[in-house]
């Protein structure tokens, strides 16, 4: 199932005429995961054609205002619009306390179910959200003394494609037996022969991976999240001319983001969290492409489509006999 990654806000610290405060949506099967929620995110969701009612989970990287001050308002809107479906909030240490300080946004007082996951201050992270089809992993980043985390959305590997012709050749009757094989269960043919899934299924099909790594120096956590990602959104606050400033403030340059993408084996790189000091981000894009050609400045409201069919292995026959 394809995934759309939609940058809603790609500015650093303050909005500009062209860029808005940090937020990024991942849409799959009409359901939305929201990463960061700076001021104005509700407007950006509307402009992107994304309904707040379809948000299943919200992930906040850290408690700097440009990444989280839109969250109380979004929760209040959900309350006012009589939301009934549950929502999961994955927050850094202190996140729940911040919401409790805002009337109308305290999770325990909202009329819809809210599941709060507060990251361990010691940085013990891992899988913070999962369904039958996807998992979201969090890792600690390096944003000076501020606790910050990045996220990796990964579809689960799916069984290989079912070969009905081979199943018939092995004596499997059409009907429920086909379904059992596709679900990974062996079946017995009318003549008593056991047919196993590996005899009629192609190689396993990997799902797509998107990583959100922002407000960080280059670090081990960010590289791990970016490992073989189909799409990596990475902090590129500064160009090379302010590399020292990037290190001082706990950010990355565009070239450093590209180096992370290259070393991690990512497929595509989106440069985000861009400083307002660069009205034209073309120099940052050029610097990144000199290291990693598949880099580009993130375009707000554009849908970056990730299709798992593009990753499917060639149908070279049954994967095994088990």
UniProtKB/Swiss-Prot annotation:
Zn(2+) 2 binds at residues 66-67, 215, 273. The active site is at residue 66. Zn(2+) 1 binds at residues 62, 64, 143, 215. One of its GO terms (molecular function) is zinc ion binding. InterPro entries: Metallo-B-lactamas, RibonucZ/Hydroxyglut_hydro, RNase_Z/BN. It comes from the Bacteria. Transmembrane segments: none annotated. It catalyses: Endonucleolytic cleavage of RNA, removing extra 3' nucleotides from tRNA precursor, generating 3' termini of tRNAs. A 3'-hydroxy group is left at the tRNA terminus and a 5'-phosphoryl group is left at the trailer molecule. The keyword Transmembrane helix does not apply. Its EC number is 3.1.26.11. Residues 300-314 have a biased composition (Basic and acidic residues). The keyword Nuclease applies. Its cofactor is Zn(2+). Keywords: Endonuclease, Hydrolase, Metal-binding, Nuclease, tRNA processing, Zinc. Gene3D superfamilies: Ribonuclease Z/Hydroxyacylglutathione hydrolase-like. Zinc phosphodiesterase, which displays some tRNA 3'-processing endonuclease activity. Probably involved in tRNA maturation, by removing a 3'-trailer from precursor tRNA. Homodimer. Belongs to the RNase Z family. This is Ribonuclease Z. It comes from Salinibacter ruber (strain DSM 13855 / M31). The lineage of its organism: Bacteria, Pseudomonadati, Rhodothermota, Rhodothermia, Rhodothermales.
């Amino acid at each position: 199932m394809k995934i759309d990654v939609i940058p809603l806000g790609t500015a650093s610290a303050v909005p500009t005429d062209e860029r808005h405060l940090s937020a990024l949506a991942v849409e799959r099967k009409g359901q939305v995961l929201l990463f960061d929620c700076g001021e104005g995110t509700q407007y950006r969701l509307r402009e992107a054609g994304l309904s707040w009612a379809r948000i299943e989970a919200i992930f906040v990287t850290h408690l700097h205002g440009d990444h989280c001050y839109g969250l109380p308002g979004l929760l209040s809107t959900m309350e006012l619009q009589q939301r009934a479906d549950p929502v999961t909030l994955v927050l850094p240490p202190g996140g729940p306390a911040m919401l409790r300080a805002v009337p109308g946004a305290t999770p325990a007082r909202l009329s819809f179910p809210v599941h709060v996951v507060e990251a361990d201050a010691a940085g013990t992270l891992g899988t913070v959200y999962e369904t039958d089809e996807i998992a979201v992993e969090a890792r600690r980043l390096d944003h000076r003394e501020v606790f910050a985390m990045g996220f990796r959305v990964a579809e689960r590997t799916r069984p290989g494609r079912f070969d009905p012709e081979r199943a018939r050749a092995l004596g499997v009757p059409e009907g429920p037996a086909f379904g059992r094989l596709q679900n990974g269960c062996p079946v017995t043919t009318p003549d008593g022969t056991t047919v196993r899934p590996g005899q009629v299924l192609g190689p396993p099909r990997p799902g797509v991976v998107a990583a959100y790594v922002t407000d960080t120096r280059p670090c081990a956590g960010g590289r791990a999240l970016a490992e073989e990602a189909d799409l990596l959104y990475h902090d590129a606050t500064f160009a090379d001319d302010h590399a020292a400033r990037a290190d001082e403030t706990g950010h990355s340059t565009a070239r450093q983001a590209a180096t992370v993408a290259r070393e991690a084996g990512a497929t595509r790189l989106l440069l985000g969290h861009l400083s307002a000091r660069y009205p034209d981000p073309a120099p940052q894009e050029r610097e990144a492409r000199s290291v990693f050609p598949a880099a580009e400045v993130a375009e707000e409201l554009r849908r970056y489509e990730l299709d798992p069919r593009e990753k499917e292995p060639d149908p070279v026959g049954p994967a095994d006999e088990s």
